[in-house]
């Protein structure tokens, strides 16, 4: 049996925070605002995984009203989600992600992101695709107000 999940997330830029995307710290003058470390890509992947097994979203499992998740490492949150997915008897078929950002350029960091995500999801890097695009200076990402991401995951029963 196969299950497909889709995820989407957006975070706003802010001064004085590190920029963490896909579990990788990226040099940039701004970071993203969030209750956790605001890793927009790992949040998107977690939502896609939870959606594939009809288990809600990360807000349900890790609410931003809970102080326990303040400044949480999104890699740890994704590992918890992935553990739950595996408990339900699923393994990863493949994951396809898109980061939507005007700046910074993501291309130099894509392979590091793929490697980190493959480690978190306990799978071959060949099952992980990460790509990036701009919005040609349109919308909030084009105005460099924040970053968005999308992901689609295919899970298969073990």
UniProtKB/Swiss-Prot annotation:
Q: Which GO terms describe its biological process?
A: isopentenyl diphosphate biosynthetic process, methylerythritol 4-phosphate pathway; terpenoid biosynthetic process
Highest rank taxon of the organism: Bacteria
UniProt-annotated site: Transition state stabilizer, residues = 35, 134
Which keywords does this Swiss-Prot/TrEMBL entry list? Isoprene biosynthesis, Lyase, Metal-binding
InterPro entries, per the entry: MECDP_synthase (IPR003526), MECDP_synthase_CS (IPR020555), MECDP_synthase_sf (IPR036571)
SUPFAM superfamilies xref list: IpsF-like
Q: In which pathway does it act?
A: Isoprenoid biosynthesis; isopentenyl diphosphate biosynthesis via DXP pathway; isopentenyl diphosphate from 1-deoxy-D-xylulose 5-phosphate: step 4/6
What is this protein called in UniProt?
2-C-methyl-D-erythritol 2,4-cyclodiphosphate synthase
> What is the species of this protein?
Bacillus cereus (strain B4264)
Question: Source gene?
Answer: ispF
């Amino acid at each position: 049996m196969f299950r497909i999940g889709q995820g989407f997330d957006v975070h706003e830029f802010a001064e004085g925070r590190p920029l963490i995307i896909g579990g990788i710290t990226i040099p940039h003058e701004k970071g993203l605002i969030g209750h956790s470390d605001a890793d927009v890509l790992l949040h998107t992947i977690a939502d896609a995984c939870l959606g594939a097994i009809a288990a809600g979203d990360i807000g349900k499992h890790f609410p931003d009203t809970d102080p326990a998740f303040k400044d949480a490492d999104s890699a740890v949150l994704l590992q918890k989600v992935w553990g739950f997915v595996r408990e339900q008897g699923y393994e990863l078929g493949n994951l396809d992600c898109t980061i939507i950002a005007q700046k910074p350029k993501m291309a130099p960091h894509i392979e590091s992101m793929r490697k980190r995500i493959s480690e978190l999801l306990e799978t071959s890097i060949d099952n992980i695709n990460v790509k990036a695009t701009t919005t040609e200076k349109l919308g909030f990402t084009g105005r460099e107000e924040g970053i968005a991401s999308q992901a689609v995951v295919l899970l298969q029963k073990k």
